């Protein structure tokens, strides 16, 4: 079944104890969801933990096998390999824009076309956003391999190796046919079954036995692990392939490793002894332009260390500017024999290697390296692990895949950077064998750490099954977001910029420099208005990387780049980056990120209203969750500078900033004029946070200044925007000004995440916040697509989506998860889960966009920007649940509290 709670866990909320497990579990705790029933519902079928009809297993409906696999967990995303998604959407294109919006953006379109032509045809570079060549729909992706920042290789749910990010930030969406697992079964010295574990029917390697029957196999993903179960018809054998990647919260070493492990558990359900072999074949390179120059070669290796022997092949790919070595390896034991074929032609029929395996279940293992390839020639290799399998027995065959690309250059080829893992394994480009050995020795410990982290959530019966899948599987983007994690040399931190930030050097030098893309199609590192949403995952799981990112943003804030360029939306010529404003992004991987920021050139974001505010809010949130006083002290001058820059947007001095009559915030296609619910709310929240930070920093004059602004701004916000049911989109005279914006409570969301926003620290009247959230649920959720697709960005008061812009009638998945967190914070837990559930089921179960969650989709036909950063905001839901439980626990009598593990307070309350 798909994302379904086991029957033993289908119990009502009223029957559950309220308790919390607070041991160190890597950023997650078991929580008991309260108020999970709809007021209209009395039966248990509406509780989040109940396995309702939508969990009936449509993705598994084609499965005809009986095998359930070896130790496959009950929760996650599960799909039969024969499944076909009925709905086939297309990426958003110009022809999806309404005529009225097309007219509005005609000038921008012409400017973009001219810029695009120069970029692609003259400069021979790829645009940071390519509106003419969107990534097409491919409903194939599964869990990526590889830790954080060392590159990733995505393996599809049907077993194909199909999405590659080895060159930093640059993606190749290509299925490499030669990259396969093959099973060979032998009885009484004779091969009785040999099959490529793939549904493909390719035009190459035609001597191989392709076309696996997908009706007897399924895939199950719970990132960073995945399981594929194959029931081999007529053989009484079940294969379970477990894929493991070292994504380990609060671990800053193994989490950086460019490795993946495949553990094959083979179960013999028959009465005869079997000899079983699994062969792992891999092409050297992807078969594209990178390989065309030739010079690729393979060689065998064997590494014996600490009682463990690992044997396999090294695939050397010396193509500049980022050469690498891939290692395919298996563990050799007393019960497991490892053999190999150094080289075969992946574009041939493949007969030689197929017959080699067929003959005796092993490979010939020739000595020496292969001859380097000629121009246009390809080469592949294979590693085979073999074992004897007793009747009713089980054996385990262990493989690893590692890639060593220690030194990288971005597209401008201006600087050499060293990946994080080189700190632990060296940077000479010869550590692929050591990485393989380490992975095969350590993966059991990784799995223990993963289980300790995930089990408190998975074991919580009050949480819905879809949420358990979404919470962990959406984390794929932290590694597969074009992510880089780099070492920071001592001489790369200018003294004049970092001198006043005392923790800058130790943070960046101890924990490195972190960057992830806005999206795989929106190629800008650390896009800050979007990171605002996604950052919850980073600060909860790898807080030092969040602090590192914040220090980088602080450094960039004080820099300027006065190079003038034409902005595409307005046509205005203005500098790339002005001093004392937060940059939109840290740069394009096809250029030189960190050195040249603000790859985004649609708007001049120096005049955006949300970036500075989001920095202030995240600084305090990060301080509150980490308790790092030194960080807050370092960031305080930066917060003062960016808030001073923001003051100019309050033109009438009423304590509330005004938007500028264009799309001057993260909704960069949705015009906002005057005081607005979104930016005005963020402003008031940031002002409130400045008051709190001023108290902590002992700055009485600053405290008084922002307290006065807050008092005036609150009054103006309520007077200008509150209409009795919700906050108006903005205060202009335009028809869309009364639209119901799903993201109108973003400021309150962050305040609550920081332990503020109620009681003495209330900014927005609680009754108004709750009323607005109920209105959003009624109109943006329930009145949109039957309540089954999440919350539309904008809804008119009479229940029709706002189509005044290309973004107002979209659903933004990351915004919906943030909205759901806000609902949970305000006690609307059932509504929050119901709202978020619509997005999960739409993306993962209906549209087939697993492990490529888009920024946006419309009610029909289109999606936009696959594999996007913002949906990581689902971790804000987890934080809201944990804080809800903490609050409940703290309200108990002292004698009751004493029986539960103590909870650390978030954020010191005294002055620094």
UniProtKB/Swiss-Prot annotation:
It catalyses: a beta-D-glucosyl-(1<->1')-N-acylsphing-4-enine + H2O = an N-acylsphing-4-enine + D-glucose; a beta-D-galactosyl-(1<->1')-N-acylsphing-4-enine + H2O = an N-acylsphing-4-enine + D-galactose; beta-D-glucosyl-(1->3)-O-lithocholate + H2O = lithocholate + D-glucose; beta-D-glucosyl-(1->3)-O-chenodeoxycholate + H2O = chenodeoxycholate + D-glucose. InterPro entries: 6-hairpin_glycosidase_sf, 6hp_glycosidase-like_sf, B_Glucosidase_GBA2-typ, GH116_catalytic, GH116_N, Non-lysos_glucosylceramidase. This is Non-lysosomal glucosylceramidase. Residues 891-902 have a biased composition (Polar residues). Its EC number is 3.2.1.45, 2.4.1.-, 3.2.1.-, 3.2.1.46. Enzymatic activity is dependent on membrane association and requires the presence of lipids. Residues 886-912 are annotated as: Disordered. It comes from the Eukaryota. Coiled coil: none annotated. GO terms for cellular component: cytosol; endoplasmic reticulum membrane; Golgi membrane; membrane. It is found in: Endoplasmic reticulum membrane; Golgi apparatus membrane. The gene is Gba2. Keywords: Cholesterol metabolism, Endoplasmic reticulum, Glycosidase, Glycosyltransferase, Golgi apparatus, Hydrolase, Lipid metabolism, Membrane, Sphingolipid metabolism, Steroid metabolism, Sterol metabolism, Transferase.
């Amino acid at each position: 079944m798909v994302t379904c709670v086991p029957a033993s866990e289908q119990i009502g909320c009223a029957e559950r104890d309220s308790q919390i497990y607070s041991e160190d579990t890597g950023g997650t705790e078991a929580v008991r969801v309260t108020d999970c029933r709809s007021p209209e519902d009395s039966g248990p079928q509406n509780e989040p933990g109940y396995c309702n009809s939508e969990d009936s297993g449509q993705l598994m409906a084609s499965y005809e096998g009986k095998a359930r696999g070896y130790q496959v967990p009950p929760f996650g995303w599960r799909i039969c390999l024969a499944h076909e998604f009925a709905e086939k959407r297309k990426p958003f294109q110009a022809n999806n824009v309404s005529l009225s919006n097309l007219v509005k953006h005609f000038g921008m379109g012409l400017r973009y076309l001219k810029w695009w032509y120069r970029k692609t045809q003259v400069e021979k570079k790829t645009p940071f956003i390519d509106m003419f060549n969107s990534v097409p729909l491919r409903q194939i992706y599964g869990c990526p391999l590889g830790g954080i920042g060392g590159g990733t290789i995505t393996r599809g749910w049907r077993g194909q190796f199909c999405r590659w990010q080895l060159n930093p930030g640059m993606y190749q969406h290509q299925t490499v046919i030669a990259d396969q697992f093959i099973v060979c079964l032998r009885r009484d010295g004779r091969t009785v079954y040999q099959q490529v574990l793939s549904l493909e029917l390719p035009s190459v390697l035609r001597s191989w036995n392709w076309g696996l029957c997908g009706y007897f196999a399924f895939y199950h993903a719970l990132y960073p692990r995945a399981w594929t179960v194959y029931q081999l018809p007529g053989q009484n054998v079940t294969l379970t392939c477990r894929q493991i990647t070292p994504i380990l919260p609060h671990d800053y070493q193994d989490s950086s490793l460019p490795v993946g492990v495949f553990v094959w558990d083979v179960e013999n359900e028959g009465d005869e002894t079997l000899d079983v072999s699994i062969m792992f074949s891999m092409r050297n390179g992807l078969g594209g332009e990178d390989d065309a120059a030739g010079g690729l070669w393979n060689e065998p290796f064997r590494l014996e260390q600490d009682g463990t022997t690992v044997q396999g092949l090294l695939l050397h790919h010396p193509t500049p500017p980022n050469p690498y070595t891939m290692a395919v390896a298996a563990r050799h034991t007393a019960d497991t024999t490892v053999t190999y074929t150094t080289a075969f032609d992946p574009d041939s029929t493949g007969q030689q290697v197929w017959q080699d395996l067929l003959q005796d279940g092993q490979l010939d293992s020739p000595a020496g390296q292969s001859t380097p390839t000629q121009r246009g020639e390809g080469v592949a290799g294979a590693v085979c692990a073999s074992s004897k399998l007793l009747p009713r027995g089980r054996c385990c065959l262990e493989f690893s895949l590692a890639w060593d690309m220690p030194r990288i250059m971005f597209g401008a080829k201006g600087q050499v950077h060293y990946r994080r893992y080189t700190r632990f394994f060296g940077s000479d480009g010869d550590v692929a064998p050591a990485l393989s050995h380490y992975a095969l020795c350590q993966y059991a410990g990784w799995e223990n750490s993963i289980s300790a982290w995930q089990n408190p959530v998975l074991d919580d019966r009050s949480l819905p099954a879809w949420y358990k899948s979404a919470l962990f599987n959406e984390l794929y983007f932290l590694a597969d977001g074009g992510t880089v994690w780099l070492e920071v040399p001592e001489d790369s931190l200018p003294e004049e910029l970092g001198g006043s930030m005392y923790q800058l050097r130790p943070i960046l030098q101890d924990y490195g420099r972190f960057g992830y893309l806005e999206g795989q199609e929106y190629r800008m590192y650390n896009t800050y208005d979007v990171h605002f949403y996604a950052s919850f995952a980073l600060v909860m799981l790898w807080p030092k990387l969040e602090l590192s990112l914040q220090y980088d943003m602080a450094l960039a804030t004080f820099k300027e780049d006065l190079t003038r360029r034409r902005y595409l939306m307005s046509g205005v010529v203005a500098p790339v980056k002005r001093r004392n404003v937060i940059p939109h992004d840290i740069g394009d991987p096809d250029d030189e990120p960190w050195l040249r920021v603000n790859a985004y050139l649609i708007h001049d974001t120096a005049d955006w209203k949300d970036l500075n505010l989001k920095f202030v809010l995240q600084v305090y949130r990060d301080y509150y969750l980490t308790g790092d006083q030194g960080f807050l002290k370092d960031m305080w001058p930066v917060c003062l500078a960016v808030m001073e820059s923001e003051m100019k947007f309050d033109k009438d001095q009423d304590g509330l900033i005004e938007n500028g009559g264009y799309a001057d915030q993260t909704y960069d296609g949705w015009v906002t004029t005057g005081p607005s619910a979104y930016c005005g709310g963020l402003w008031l929240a940031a002002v409130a946070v400045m008051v709190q930070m001023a108290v902590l920093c002992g700055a009485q004059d600053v405290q008084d200044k922002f307290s006065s602004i807050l008092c005036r701004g609150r009054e103006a916000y309520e007077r200008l925007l509150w209409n009795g049911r919700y906050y108006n989109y903005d205060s202009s005279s335009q028809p869309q000004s009364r639209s119901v914006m799903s993201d109108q409570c973003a400021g309150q969301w962050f305040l609550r995440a920081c332990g503020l926003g109620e009681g003495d620290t209330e900014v927005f009247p609680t009754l108004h916040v709750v009323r607005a959230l109920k209105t959003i649920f009624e109109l943006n959720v329930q009145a949109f697509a039957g309540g089954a697709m999440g919350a539309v960005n904008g809804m008119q008061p009479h229940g029709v989506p706002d189509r005044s812009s290309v973004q107002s009638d979209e659903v933004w998945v990351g915004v919906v998860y943030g909205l759901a967190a806000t609902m949970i914070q305000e006690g609307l837990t059932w509504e929050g889960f119901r709202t978020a559930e619509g997005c999960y089921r739409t993306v993962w179960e209906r549209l087939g966009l697993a492990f490529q969650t888009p920024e946006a989709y419309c009610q029909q036909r289109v999606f936009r920007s696959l594999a996007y950063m913002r949906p990581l905001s689902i971790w804000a839901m987890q934080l809201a649940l944990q804080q809800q439980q903490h609050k409940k626990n703290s309200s108990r009598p002292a004698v009751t509290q004493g029986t539960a593990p103590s909870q650390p307070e978030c954020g010191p309350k005294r002055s620094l």
